[in-house]
C-alpha cells in the first residue's frame, strides 16, 4: 500500500506540472499575435503515396515540442520565467525551455505552395491545397487540407538522342533499357532519376564532360496523361566529329603526398594499386573515381585523399593525380576508469598502443594492457577481500581479405577486414584464481553500397585454467552436498572452447537486424571419434586433459523505430537466443549461458536476478549461477522524447525471461514448456532519463516490476500490488538499450 501511495503522489504531481505549464503557455505571446497551437494535415481519399506525416514535414512552421506527444512542457518551463533577464533563475528557465512559436501567415502561404508542389511532383497535376485556421483566445491552429485528385500517367514516351554514338551506347531502341515506362504514374522524381541514370551510365563509359543538364524533357498533357519526350542535347564544342560527346581515356596516373612537411607516401605500391580503381589507358569512370575515394577513405593510415583530373590540350586524354596524406602512424593512450560491480567499487586503467600502418599496408596493430582493482564487501573466511585483474590483448587488423587464391579484383570489390587477436587474462579473487588464454581469426566484410555487414569467426579458441581455489570456497560451495550443483561445479573447472561462427547485421537507421550463429567442439569430436580417443568417467573426450565444450547457439535481435517528429520516437525491440549443449557436453559453458534483468533487458530487475522460468531461491536471495539459462526472450517498447538542452526521456515496457531446455534438479521450474509460457513471462515498466552528449549517451532508467513469474497470488502481479522496496530497480548505463 505504501508503494501505491508513492505512485499515486507521483502521478498527481506529474499532472499538476502539466496543468501549470499549460496555463502559462501564452504569457510571452504579444497582443495581436497568436501562439501556433497545432499544425494538422488532412488528405482527401488518402492515396498510398501521400501520407499526412510526410505532408506535415513540409510545414514551414511547427508547433512547440510536446513531451511524449502530449504536453508542451518546454514551452511551459520557458513561460515560468520572469521578464527580468538580470536574474539567473529567469535565464536558466529560458535556456531550459522553448520560446513560443508565433503564427506567421506568410510562412503558412509558403507552406501551401510547397504542398501543392509536392503533390505536383507526385503526379497530381490537378491538386489543390486549402488553408484553414481556428483561433481560441491567443492560440491558433492551422489545418492544411490536401485534395490530390486523380494522378496523371505517362502516355507516349520518346527518347530523342542527337548523338548517334551515345544512342548506340544506351541501346534505347529497346524499351527494356528505358528507365521510364509508359502507363506508370507520372512523378517528377522519376524523371530526375532517369536523368541521373543516363548521366551516370555515360560518365562510367568515358564521357568525362557529360552532365545531367544535357538531358531535358518536353511534355504535353491530354486527359490524365503526360506525353514525354526525353531530349539529349549535343555538346556544341564537338561539332564536326563522329560523336558530339567525347570519350576520355586516362593517359597518366600519378601519386603524390598531400603533406607539405613529408613528401613520402608511407604505403606500399601494391596497396596503392589495389586501392585505385582508375586505370591508365582505361576510359574515365565516375564510379571508379568514387570507389577509389571510398577505398582510400577506409584505410586507417590515410587521413586525406584528393583526386584531380587535367585535360590534355587538343586530345581526349586525361592526366590523373592522386594526393594522399597519411596519419601519424603510432599513438599511445591512457584511460582510467571507475568500476562498480554489484555494489563493489574499484578502479581500472588501460594503456593502449596503436600503429595504423604496421607493414606500410594500413595494417592496424593494437596492444592493450589493462589492470583493475576492486574491494569486495561481505566476504568472510578468506585471507583477503581484494580482486585483481591484469590482461594483455593484441589485435592485428588487415584492411582486406587475407585468403589464398583470392584475386586482387575480388579483394577490391568487397570492403573487408581480416583480424587476428591474442589475449591473456589474469584474475585473482579471494575465492579462486583464473587464467584465460584466447586466440581468434575472423573476417568482416560489407558489400558495396549496402547497409549490411557479415562476420565469420573462422576460429575462436578459449582456454580457461583454474590454478587455485581456496579451501573455504571449496568447503562452502563445491564440496558441501547441500549447496553444490552441476552448474556451479562446471563454472569452476578448467574449460576449453574451440568455436566457429557466422554473423549478419543490417541497419538502415529505422530498422536494425542482427543475427549470429556459433558452434563449438564439432571438429574436435570428429577427430576424437576417428582416432578412437579415450574418454573420462563421464564419457567425455578431452584435449590437453580438459573435456572440451560442444554446443550450438543462435541469436537474433530486431529493432524498429517510428519517428513521429524530431522530438518523439517509438522504438520496438525483439531479442531471441537459443543454445543447446550436446555430444561432449551436458551443460553450456557459463560464459555462453543467457541471463536476464539489468539495463538492457527486463529493467524491473537487477542483472541476473530473474528466471529461469519460475525458478526462485527459497531464501529469496539472488543466485547468479542458477539464474542463467539456455534460452532467452526479450520484448521491449520505448517511447522516447526530447525534453530540453541535452536531456531526453523515455517511457518503457519490457517483457521476457530466460529458460533451460532441459530439466535440471538445481533449477526447478526453469524448463521451457510452451503450455506454461503465459505464466512464465515477466514484465516491467518504467521511466528513463538520457543525457545525449552526441558522442555518447549517459542513461538512467527507473524500472518497476509488473508481472513476476517467480511468485503466486498478489506477488505475481506487482503492477496491481506495488511495493517500492521489492519491485523497484535503478540502472545506470552508457548508450541506448537497443
Language model features with spans:
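C-terminal motif of bacterial Sec signal peptides marking the signal peptidase cleavage site
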Residues: 19-22
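Periplasmic polypeptide-binding modules associated with outer-membrane biogenesis and secretion
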Residues: 2-3, 24-340, 370, 552-556, ...
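Conserved active-site loop/cleft motifs that coordinate metal ions or position small ligands
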Residues: 649-652, 697-703
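C-terminal outer-membrane beta-barrel translocator/porin domains of Gram-negative envelope proteins
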Residues: 339-342, 455-641, 651-674
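Hydrophobic, well-ordered secondary-structure elements that form the walls
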Residues: 296, 353, 396, 515, ...
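Bacterial N-terminal signal peptides that target proteins for export
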Residues: 1-11
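A generic beta-sheet turn/junction motif
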Residues: 137, 150, 313, 508, ...
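Gram-negative/organellar outer-membrane beta-barrel architecture
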Residues: 166, 170-171, 265, 285-514, ...
Amino acid at each position: 500500500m505504501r508503494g501505491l501511495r508513492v505512485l499515486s503522489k507521483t502521478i498527481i504531481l506529474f499532472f499538476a506540472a502539466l496543468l501549470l505549464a499549460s496555463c502559462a503557455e501564452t504569457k510571452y505571446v504579444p497582443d495581436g499575435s497568436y501562439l501556433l497551437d497545432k499544425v494538422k494535415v488532412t488528405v482527401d481519399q488518402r492515396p498510398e503515396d501521400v501520407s499526412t506525416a510526410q505532408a506535415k514535414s513540409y510545414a514551414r512552421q511547427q508547433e512547440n515540442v510536446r513531451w511524449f506527444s502530449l504536453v508542451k512542457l518546454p514551452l511551459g518551463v520557458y513561460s515560468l520565467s520572469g521578464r527580468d533577464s538580470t536574474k539567473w533563475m529567469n535565464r536558466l528557465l529560458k535556456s531550459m525551455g522553448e520560446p513560443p512559436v508565433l503564427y506567421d501567415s506568410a510562412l503558412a502561404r509558403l507552406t501551401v505552395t510547397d504542398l501543392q508542389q509536392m503533390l505536383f511532383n507526385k503526379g497530381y497535376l490537378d491538386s489543390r491545397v486549402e488553408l484553414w485556421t481556428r483561433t481560441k483566445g491567443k492560440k491558433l491552429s492551422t489545418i492544411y487540407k490536401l485534395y490530390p485528385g486523380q494522378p496523371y500517367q505517362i502516355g507516349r514516351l520518346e527518347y530523342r538522342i542527337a548523338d548517334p554514338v551515345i544512342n548506340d551506347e544506351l541501346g534505347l531502341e529497346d524499351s527494356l533499357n528505358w528507365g521510364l515506362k509508359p502507363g506508370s504514374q507520372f512523378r517528377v522524381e522519376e524523371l530526375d532519376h532517369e536523368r541521373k541514370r543516363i548521366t551516370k551510365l555515360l560518365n562510367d563509359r568515358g564521357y568525362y564532360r557529360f552532365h545531367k543538364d544535357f538531358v531535358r524533357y518536353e511534355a504535353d498533357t491530354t486527359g490524365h496523361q503526360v506525353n514525354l519526350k526525353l531530349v539529349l542535347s549535343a555538346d556544341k564544342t564537338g561539332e564536326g566529329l563522329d560523336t558530339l560527346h567525347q570519350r576520355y581515356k586516362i593517359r597518366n596516373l600519378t601519386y603524390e603526398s598531400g603533406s607539405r612537411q613529408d613528401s613520402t607516401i608511407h604505403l606500399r605500391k601494391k596497396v596503392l594499386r589495389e586501392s585505385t580503381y582508375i586505370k591508365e589507358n582505361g576510359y574515365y569512370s565516375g564510379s571508379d573515381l568514387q570507389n577509389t575515394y571510398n577505398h582510400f577513405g577506409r584505410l586507417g593510415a590515410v587521413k586525406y585523399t584528393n583526386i584531380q583530373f587535367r585535360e590534355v590540350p587538343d586530345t581526349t586524354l586525361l592526366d590523373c593525380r592522386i594526393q594522399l596524406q597519411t596519419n601519424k602512424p603510432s599513438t599511445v593512450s591512457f584511460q582510467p576508469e571507475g568500476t562498480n560491480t554489484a555494489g563493489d567499487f574499484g578502479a581500472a586503467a588501460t594503456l593502449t598502443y596503436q600503429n595504423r600502418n604496421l607493414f606500410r599496408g594500413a595494417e592496424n596493430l593494437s596492444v592493450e594492457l589493462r589492470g583493475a582493482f576492486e574491494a569486495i564487501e561481505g566476504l568472510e573466511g578468506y585471507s583477503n577481500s581484494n580482486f585483481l585483474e591484469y590482461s594483455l590483448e593484441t589485435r592485428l587488423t588487415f584492411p582486406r581479405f587475407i585468403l589464398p587464391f583470392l584475386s586482387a579484383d575480388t579483394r577490391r570489390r568487397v570492403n573487408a577486414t581480416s583480424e587476428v587477436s591474442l589475449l591473456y587474462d589474469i584474475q585473482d579473487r579471494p575465492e579462486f584464481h583464473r587464467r584465460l588464454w584466447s586466440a581468434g581469426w575472423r573476417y568482416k566484410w560489407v558489400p558495396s553500397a549496402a547497409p549490411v555487414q557479415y562476420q565469420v569467426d573462422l576460429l575462436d579458441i578459449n582456454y580457461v585454467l583454474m590454478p587455485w581455489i581456496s579451501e573455504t570456497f571449496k568447503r562452502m560451495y563445491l564440496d558441501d552436498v547441500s549447496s553444490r550443483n552441476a552448474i556451479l561445479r562446471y563454472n569452476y573447472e578448467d574449460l576449453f572452447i574451440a568455436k566457429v561462427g557466422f554473423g549478419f547485421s543490417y541497419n538502415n537507421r529505422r530498422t536494425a537486424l542482427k543475427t549470429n550463429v556459433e558452434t563449438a567442439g564439432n571438429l574436435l569430436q570428429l577427430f576424437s571419434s576417428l582416432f578412437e580417443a579415450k574418454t573420462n568417467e563421464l564419457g567425455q573426450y578431452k584435449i590437453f586433459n580438459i573435456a572440451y565444450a560442444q554446443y550450438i547457439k543462435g541469436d537474433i535481435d530486431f529493432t524498429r523505430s517510428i519517428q513521429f517528429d524530431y522530438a518523439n520516437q517509438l522504438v520496438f525491440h525483439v531479442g531471441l537466443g537459443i543454445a543447446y549443449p550436446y555430444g561432449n557436453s551436458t551443460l553450456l559453458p557459463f560464459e555462453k549461458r543467457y541471463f536476464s534483468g539489468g539495463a538492457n533487458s527486463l529493467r524491473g530487475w537487477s542483472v541476473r536476478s530473474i528466471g529461469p522460468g519460475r525458478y526462485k531461491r527459497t531464501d529469496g536471495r539472488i543466485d547468479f549461477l542458477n539464474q542463467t539459462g539456455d534460452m532467452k526472450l526479450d520484448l521491449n517498447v520505448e517511447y522516447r522524447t526530447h525534453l530540453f538542452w541535452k536531456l531526453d526521456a523515455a517511457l518503457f515496457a519490457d517483457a521476457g525471461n530466460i529458460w533451460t531446455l532441459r530439466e535440471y534438479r538445481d533449477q526447478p521450474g526453469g524448463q521451457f514448456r510452451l503450455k506454461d509460457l503465459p505464466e512464465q513471462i515477466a514484465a516491467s515498466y518504467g521511466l528513463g532519463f538520457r543525457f545525449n552528449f552526441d558522442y555518447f549517451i549517459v542513461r538512467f532508467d527507473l524500472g518497476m516490476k509488473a508481472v513476476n513469474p517467480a511468485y503466486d497470488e498478489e506477488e505475481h502481479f506487482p503492477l496491481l500490488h506495488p511495493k517500492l522496496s521489492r519491485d523497484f530497480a535503478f540502472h545506470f548505463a552508457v548508450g541506448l538499450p537497443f
